[in-house]
Amino acid sequence: MMDAKGRVWITQYVRPNEVPGWCLEGSDNPFADYYPIQHQRESRQVSYYDPETEKFVLIDTCYFTHHLQFADDANDTLWLSGSTEAIGWLNTRLYDQTGDERAAQGWCPTVIDTNGDGRITKPWNEPGRGASFDPNRDTRVVAGSYGLVADPEVGTAVWLSSAQYPGKLVRMDVGESPPESCLTEVYEVPSVLDPMVPTDLTGFGPRGIDIDRNGVVWTALSGSSAFASFDRTKCDVTGPEILDGRHCLEGWTIYPTPGPTIQNTDPPVRADYHYYNWVDQHNTLGLGENIPIANGSNSDALLALMPDTGEWVVLRVPYPQGFFSRGLDGRIDDPNTGWKGRGVWADYGTNAVWHIEGGKGTKSNLVKFQIRPNPLAH
């Protein structure tokens, strides 16, 4: 991901898998003292490439990383997903000032306020089959994390997707004095596991995740091939039922994506596959602001949803070019030239390039999408 200085941030290996001692029990690091990393072999950290110096800068992290996303805050916070036990972040402004990777990073375990006092306190219930549960304590969960996005309305909060069946959205607000102020919420995708949910409103398999400027979260359900939105403002985030994440069905809306269904599936599972999704917050495509778009990875398309009407706009890359997309993003090159100065870019995932017309040696591509305000617009 690119920052405001034009540097490109990457999650990558920067050291052998063994986690440094300062991340573990017995360290004087405040985050390790609060929650020492349990998995002592973590295989990916973070780096950035600076085009001006043409150099990579390697930054060690205590926690495993996978996806990365900047927050819109004064610290240029870089949120990092991937760890099954903690959510991590890097204060890139502090790192630029000091070069101190230990002081600039933090992490928190995913602990839910199951005793309802509005804060997380130790000791807490630990996860695990057969583990005892004390309702007077808070509860740590192994949520897992894949996609993530910062909350534009709450600068200290981040959302993540977990694909553990049927899938969950995880929200962590680190508060004003982390790690002690960190607090996690979990919301399970409505599924056939919950008898309260009608089968036609179920889904599973969130991967991609993004958010609109109003704080509504959008996730593409890669398992059931649907788009789901989640509005936390409709929820009561307290009570004993918050542990299983089924306490806010009213926050969810499921939008089945267009296309054929797989034969003999009940409830119907669509044949398309949505590797990731993105929300066009700033009208880079031309359909308006806050338009959610899913990768139609199995349908040679991007699928844009008009949330006010439920109408789908299918942006198909015509045969025989083929188009197996795994991600997309928007860019405004010139805000003063109308539709010509903006567009959405999507990639060809390299893992299926050899299935595209052309056979062996066929290379991946980028595709630019633009929508004119009318067919004759110039």
Which residues does each predicted region cover?
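Blade-level signature of beta-propeller repeat domains, shared across WD40, Kelch, NHL, RCC1
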Residues: 88, 226-229, 321-378
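Structural recognition of the beta-propeller blade-terminating site
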Residues: 50, 91-92, 173-174, 231-232, ...
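Short, conserved, GDST-rich strand-edge loop motifs in beta-rich repeat architectures
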Residues: 10-41, 84-110, 160-171, 224-245, ...
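Surface-exposed loop and turn segments in beta-propeller and other repeat-based domains
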Residues: 38-63, 93-143, 176-202, 234-278, ...
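Surface-exposed loop/turn positions within WD40 beta-propeller blades
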Residues: 5, 43, 53, 65, ...
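Structural signature of eukaryotic scaffold interfaces centered on beta-propeller domains
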Residues: 1-5, 67-75, 131-155, 202-214, ...
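Conserved beta-propeller blade signature
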Residues: 7-11, 76-81, 157-161, 216-220, ...
